[in-house]
Amino acid sequence: MSKQILILPGDGIGPEIMAEAVKVLELANDKYSLGFELSHDVIGGAAIDKHGVPLADETLDRARAADAVLLGAVGGPKWDKIERDIRPERGLLKIRAQLGLFGNLRPAILYPQLADASSLKPEIVSGLDILIVRELTGGIYFGAPRGTRELENGERQSYDTLPYSESEIRRIARVGFDMARVRGKKLCSVDKANVLASSQLWREVVEQVAKDYPDVELSHMYVDNAAMQLVRAPKQFDVIVTDNMFGDILSDEASMLTGSIGMLPSASLDANNKGMYEPCHGSAPDIAGQGIANPLATILSVSMMLRYSFNLTEAADAIEQAVSRVLDQGLRTGDIWSAGCTKVGTQEMGDAVVAALRNL
């Protein structure tokens, strides 16, 4: 029986980078007889333009029916002034919540070929391989009540809510421990337990879960210190588990240790490892349509999809090896270019990965 993959290119550079990822996926599909069937739909600003909402009900139904979703990026200045509840980003939040995608895996890996592209000295980041496990459907991004009210003195005051239940914390903690168990057996839980009640519960529950993983070394770190340590000595970390907002911020910080956020894929998984896969970067509307965006994060998201949702290790490894070979050839998009390398565009980079994969 064929497996259904829903393709959601999104906005900005999304369609450009997705076109290259789809080429790689289609080749892998043929080369390894994966049995995938691909279908396409719209999300974000593209969905607003077509349906008037950032995620149409029929698109959500197709996502539920699919075995995995591959997404580009959403958002752009075109939709910045519309009502907040129907902005492109709300479509992304909704599909995550409705599909139960509570576990976000964001690797930060420095390819040896890109050591000079990192913002830190090579000796600080050489060999970097961190996995950030971010809780994705709870916390302040979804908490209620939220809003803006007028105080007695006429001044406006805005407020948000940061709730976490024991079950929400427990399930993401288990993802963190499971990932640490198959990696370096070190897990750092990041919170703000010296200030936030939600973080105090977070730390308590993580400690409880740790009893089931005696082979994994658990440490705790306040988020402000973690942000500093990621720059000071990033290789002390193996797996980091943290809440929605902290994970959002720390994973973007970690991305720049690798040279470019354009290199980093991500996976968002439900309890059964059904997932949505997307690059960590945004829609980059400032370069959309210019053919210069880096498609490698989206291509590597395909690899993550094969690995985590379908357990297709051989095909996943091959795509990652193809990307590494292209970097060995000195091909670079502008965001990772350095002297002595060859600058290429989006399509050229995608074609190079396809050629490398075909020749493996």
Curated annotation (Swiss-Prot):
GO MF term (any one) = NAD binding
Query: Which reactions fall under this protein's catalytic activity?
Result: (2R,3S)-3-isopropylmalate + NAD(+) = 4-methyl-2-oxopentanoate + CO2 + NADH
| Cellular localisation | Cytoplasm
GO BP field: L-leucine biosynthetic process
To which pathway does this protein belong?
A: Amino-acid biosynthesis; L-leucine biosynthesis; L-leucine from 3-methyl-2-oxobutanoate: step 3/4
Keywords attached to this Swiss-Prot or TrEMBL record, sorted alphabetically, are: Amino-acid biosynthesis, Branched-chain amino acid biosynthesis, Cytoplasm, Leucine biosynthesis, Magnesium, Manganese, Metal-binding, NAD, Oxidoreductase
**Residues engaged in binding NAD(+):** 76-89, 282-294
Positions of Mg(2+) binding: D224, D248, D252
Annotated residues that bind substrate are located at R96, R106, R134, D224
Kindly report, in one word, the top-level EC class recorded for this enzyme. oxidoreductase
**Site entry: Important for catalysis:** Y141, K192
Task: Name the cofactor(s).
Answer: Mg(2+); Mn(2+)
Q: What EC number is given for this enzyme?
A: 1.1.1.85
- Cellular compartments per GO CC: cytosol
NCBIfam families, A to Z:
leuB
PANTHER family noted in UniProt: 3-ISOPROPYLMALATE DEHYDROGENASE (PTHR42979:SF1)
The family this protein is said to belong to: Belongs to the isocitrate and isopropylmalate dehydrogenases family. LeuB type 1 subfamily.
Biological function? Catalyzes the oxidation of 3-carboxy-2-hydroxy-4-methylpentanoate (3-isopropylmalate) to 3-carboxy-4-methyl-2-oxopentanoate. The product decarboxylates to 4-methyl-2 oxopentanoate.
Record note on quaternary structure: Homodimer.
- The entry's protein name is 3-isopropylmalate dehydrogenase
